[in-house]
Amino acid sequence: MEGGGGGLGGEPGLLQQILSLRLVPRVGNVTDCQRATLCSFPEMWYGVFLWALVSSLFFHIPAGLLALFTLRHHKYGRFMSVGIFLMGVLGPISAGILTSAAIAGVYKAAGKEMIPFEALVLGVGQTFCVLIVSFLRILATL
């Protein structure tokens, strides 16, 4: 187990694969793709979905904590933070699964490989689009 390895036959360990953006473990994978790319549908889907989930939590956790802090003395307002936390998780789980699968399906149908940075951009882009639409909907009600 030198160098953070721990896999079979010199393969990197699970933690090292996740930290190096190789999100889906490749044990005994005999594909033609390069090691630095995501080439199968589950790898692409999982990569985009995880980045969408993490970036959503990155925005919703501070917003929920801010709501909890500012509305802590309000009778019903303090429960608003629970809704914010739930939307930070349920939004990517419900819609993020579908949109990430659609993105991965387009890449797979086109026969393209996805580099991990593309998964990051597409996942964070989904969250950014949701934030823009949410902000514009709230702004329209004022």
UniProtKB/Swiss-Prot annotation:
Cellular-component GO terms for this entry: endoplasmic reticulum membrane; nuclear envelope
Positions in the Lumenal compartment: 1-48, 100-114
GO biological process, one term: endoplasmic reticulum tubular network organization
Stretches that traverse the bilayer: 49-69, 79-99, 115-135
The keyword Transmembrane belongs to this UniProt entry's keyword annotation: yes
Membrane association type: Multi-pass membrane protein
UniProt keywords, alphabetically: Endoplasmic reticulum, Glycoprotein, Membrane, Nucleus, Transmembrane, Transmembrane helix
Glycosylated residues, chain numbering: 29
InterPro entries from the UniProt entry: Transmembrane_pr_170
Cytoplasmic domain ranges by topology: 70-78, 136-142
Task of the protein: May regulate membrane morphogenesis in the endoplasmic reticulum (ER) by promoting ER sheet formation at the expense of ER tubules.
Protein name as annotated: Transmembrane protein 170A
